[in-house]
């Protein structure tokens, strides 16, 4: 018994270093895994809301473009009709 006590005292004491795991530091409940998992319900809902807002803006832009396209086509039609009217007044095309 005395020998084991002396041998334990003769060994230098090794103190453990303070360490934390990344899992413990990633956050409390609800933090997504670092592997790119789906996340918690709040994050999924937030992403869905952002995606919806983006789709709405894109839809509005698309409707604006369609409206401008219709206006341009109407303008081209009036110009084409005007050209046809002028050529009829001058006696048509003579080739």
Swiss-Prot record:
MF annotations from Gene Ontology: ATPase inhibitor activity
Span of chain positions assigned to the transit peptide in the UniProt entry: 1-25
Cellular component, GO, one term: mitochondrion
Self-association state and partner proteins as the record states: Associates with the mitochondrial small ribosomal subunit (mt-SSU). IF(1) coiled-coil forms a helical bundle with the C-terminal extension of uS17m and also binds to mS27 in the mtSSU tail. Since the C-terminal extension of uS17m stabilizing the IF(1) on the mt-SSU is specific to N.crassa, IF(1) binding might also be specific.
Keywords from the named record: Mitochondrion, Transit peptide
Keyword Mitochondrion: yes
InterPro entries: ATPase_inhibitor_mt
Family: Belongs to the ATPase inhibitor family.
Gene3D superfamilies: Single helix bin
Organism: Neurospora crassa (strain ATCC 24698 / 74-OR23-1A / CBS 708.71 / DSM 1257 / FGSC 987)
Domains (record comment): The inhibitory N-terminal region (residues 23-59) is entrapped between the C-terminal domains of the alpha(ADP-bound)-beta(ADP-bound) (atp1-atp2) subunits in one of the 3 catalytic interfaces of F(1)F(0)-ATPase.
Organism superkingdom: Eukaryota
Cellular location(s): Mitochondrion
Designated name of the protein: F(1)-ATPase inhibitor IF(1), mitochondrial
């Amino acid at each position: 018994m005395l020998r084991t006590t002396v041998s334990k005292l003769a060994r230098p004491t090794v103190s453990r270093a303070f360490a934390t795991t990344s899992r413990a530091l990633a956050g409390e409940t609800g933090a997504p895994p670092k592997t790119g998992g789906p996340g918690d319900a709040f994050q999924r809902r937030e992403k869905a809301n952002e995606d919806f807002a983006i789709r709405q803006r894109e839809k509005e832009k698309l409707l604006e473009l369609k409206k401008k396209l219709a206006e341009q086509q109407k303008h081209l039609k009036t110009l084409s009709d005007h050209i046809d009217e002028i050529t009829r007044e001058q006696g048509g095309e003579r080739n």
